[in-house]
């Protein structure tokens, strides 16, 4: 991990700088503070792909510009965020007395870790970012910028899983800009999606007084979000 980025990021999220310097990686890639946090860094996940898919199938034909289409995607992201935050209310945690012995403040306050600690933040994963970006980049380029593909034809092709639309499928798959190739055309879309995701969780508090941390990762959601 990159300390220069991680420490500043954790500090902006409200972690004390001393604690931010002491972060560890929890299992996969999420950041937690050992001994001082009851954070759940992957309590649920938001699907970027679902946000793009719904915007495409339900609204693309009515969009006169890419900005209008992007606004639909952003609305879907915010809607998912609302639902996820509601679903995390009143989550029951089983008591963990042995773990509590090792957490700051639990013994002193006669309080089990399941009831909270210094940090009680929930992390929401954003899944499928590369697929979502690739899809939006293809739509931006071929539907709006070059107008090479009619939006109604694209929606019909998607509804038929490209059966009868092989040529369009090959263009979208092989020629469209792709995320992760140092191509600003696609990468700027990724930045926009992530910023929208972050804004959708900004200022929210869970029922333990913690914040909702946005993050990325598709592990274990390959099937659930497919």
What does each of the following model-derived ranges do?
Residues 1-226:
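Conserved catalytic cores of very large enzyme subunits
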